[in-house]
Amino acid sequence: ELHLKHQPRHIECFDNSNLQGTNAVAACVVFRDGKPSRKEYRHFNIKSVEGIDDFASMREIVHRRYSRLLEEGTPLPDLIIVDGGKGQLSSAYGVLKALGIADRVPIVGLAERLEEVFYPNDPLPYYLSRTGEPLKVICHIRDEAHRFGITFHRQKRSKNFIVSELDSIKGIGEK
């Protein structure tokens, strides 16, 4: 149903998370043969983006992830899913093109709410069968990326809150 040449056995999914532009992070989850491969999950602190810019954040993490895999000679996934619509997808796809791997790795965007699937260079969304297995699988993977990213974001936010509260106490905080 996803119009792929081969059934994907190795899938990676990306999700960004921030609170009004602060503590921007992203997550990459990896599924192999339909099961989470938690040891391969990755968190990313967004380094190059100030404020709220999901597209720039997506470009940064996709570039960091796949330039590293290429450098290490690590096999690329059979499918990349980005949490988001056309904008996030085209940001990620642009990076894959720049790295020279856009023709080697299929990529889709999955927009929440209507569960629309977007393909590069196609302005119209594709709707998978609501009861079909492909939609259930990619939604499960996307939701896992979201959960993993939100958990990391909360940890980072909580840690930053504690640090800043202690820093403001005279004699305890930074000198």
Predicted regions and their residues:
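Acidic, glycine-enriched active-site microenvironments
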Residues: 1-175
